[in-house]
């Protein structure tokens, strides 16, 4: 079945996602952004060198700066950072078709409420099915046509499989899930752990420490996901372990680079920190973990370091001298 798909958000990920769906050739795809001049340039030049240098966008991809462009779309993907999603949903939600499925592509938790993004979408758009797309995929890799696999989760498997079929292509494969909680929290919490791994790298304390953080961080993620109603198996999949390994080891990751800067003792630009999803997620996850009585020492340490409440050397000592326990 052919779908009409709108991707909202003309940053790197939104543009890459729109391009790879358009290349699959099964759906009519429109990339929707707020900047009329940018969208006109993308339409005429088929290049978005500011975020995806040298990558030619497909001729079949349409562009629009009009909110009304989402009208008639059967699938609408919100591909902007988590803290900007609520405003975007309110702006574009007025124009959605009554049967449109909405998909959040952000990896974060609402900072003020601690809610998942699907909670926000269901609150703002109560008449629409809501799904989440997450997993190990850098925008540049997706746009270049490098093999990438991610997860898409909806309330029902029928909807999840429909979305996976509509969005997947030769080089971009989606796995269907019904665990929206696990898929979202994996995407949010791995950013915190990527910052921790960046601190380790910036501090120069070895790959063994990074491996320990990945393994023990995965245990933290699993405890948190299960406590919030998700499934432990999801944490071991693409949206959990897969995304964690990618983000904690690749310098394409903003979160890893932010952690490296912290580890080196560099003065971090507040504007840079504002773009790092893990910087938001750390404080929210640490607060929620305390409310749920969940042990998350790595997440707590990252939150305290970012807030300036804990020195990195003290954080390392605290983690290494915790009471001995079973794995």
From Swiss-Prot:
Keywords: Cytoplasm, Lipid biosynthesis, Lipid metabolism, NAD, NADP, Nucleotide-binding, Oxidoreductase, Phospholipid biosynthesis, Phospholipid metabolism. It comes from Rhizobium etli (strain ATCC 51251 / DSM 11541 / JCM 21823 / NBRC 15573 / CFN 42). Catalyzes the reduction of the glycolytic intermediate dihydroxyacetone phosphate (DHAP) to sn-glycerol 3-phosphate (G3P), the key precursor for phospholipid synthesis. InterPro entries: 6-PGluconate_DH-like_C_sf, 6PGD_dom2, G3P_DH_NAD-dep, G3P_DH_NAD-dep_C, G3P_DH_NAD-dep_N, NAD(P)-bd_dom_sf. One of its GO terms (biological process) is glycerophospholipid metabolic process. GO terms for molecular function: glycerol-3-phosphate dehydrogenase [NAD(P)+] activity; NAD binding. PROSITE patterns: NAD_G3PDH. It is an enzyme of class 1 (oxidoreductase). The active site is at residue 190. Pfam families: NAD_Gly3P_dh_C, NAD_Gly3P_dh_N. Gene3D superfamilies: N-(1-d-carboxylethyl)-l-norvaline Dehydrogenase, domain 2, NAD(P)-binding Rossmann-like Domain. NADPH binds at residues 13, 34, 107, 139, 254, 276-277. One of its GO terms (cellular component) is cytosol. It is found in: Cytoplasm. Its main location: cytoplasm. Pathway: Membrane lipid metabolism; glycerophospholipid metabolism. This is Glycerol-3-phosphate dehydrogenase [NAD(P)+]. It catalyses: sn-glycerol 3-phosphate + NAD(+) = dihydroxyacetone phosphate + NADH + H(+); sn-glycerol 3-phosphate + NADP(+) = dihydroxyacetone phosphate + NADPH + H(+). Sn-glycerol 3-phosphate binds at residues 107, 135, 190, 243, 253-255. Belongs to the NAD-dependent glycerol-3-phosphate dehydrogenase family.
């Amino acid at each position: 079945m052919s779908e009409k798909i709108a991707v909202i958000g003309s940053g790197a990920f939104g543009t890459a996602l729109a391009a790879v769906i358009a290349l699959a050739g099964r759906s009519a795809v429109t990339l929707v952004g707020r900047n009329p001049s940018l969208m006109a340039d993308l339409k005429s030049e088929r290049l978005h060198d500011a975020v995806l240098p040298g990558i030619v966008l497909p001729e079949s991809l349409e562009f629009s700066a009009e909110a009304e462009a989402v009208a008639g779309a059967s699938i609408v993907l919100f591909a902007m950072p988590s803290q900007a999603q609520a405003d975007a949903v309110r702006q574009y939600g007025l124009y959605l078709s009554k049967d449109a499925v909405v998909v959040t592509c952000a990896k974060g938790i609402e900072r003020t409420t601690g809610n998942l993004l699907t909670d926000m979408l269901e609150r703002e758009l109560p008449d629409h099915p809501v799904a989440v797309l997450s997993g190990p995929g850098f925008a540049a890799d997706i746009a270049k046509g490098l093999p990438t696999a991610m997860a898409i989760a909806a309330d029902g498997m029928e909807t999840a499989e429909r979305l996976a079929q509509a969005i997947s292509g030769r080089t971009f494969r989606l796995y269907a899930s019904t665990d929206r909680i696990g898929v979202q929290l994996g995407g949010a919490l791995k950013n915190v752990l990527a910052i921790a791994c960046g601190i380790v790298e910036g501090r120069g304390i070895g790959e063994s420490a990074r491996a320990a953080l990945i393994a023990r961080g995965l245990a933290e993620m699993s405890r948190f996901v299960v406590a919030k109603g998700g499934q432990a198996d999801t944490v071991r999949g693409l949206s959990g372990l897969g995304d964690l390994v990618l983000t904690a080891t690749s310098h394409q990751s903003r979160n890893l680079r932010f952690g490296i800067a912290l580890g080196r003792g560099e003065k971090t630009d507040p504007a840079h920190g504002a773009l790092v999803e893990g910087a938001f997620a750390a404080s929210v996850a640490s607060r929620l973990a305390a409310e749920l009585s969940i042990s998350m020492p790595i997440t707590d340490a990252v939150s305290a370091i970012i807030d300036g409440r804990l020195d990195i050397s003290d954080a390392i000592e605290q983690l290494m001298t915790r009471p001995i326990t079973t794995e």
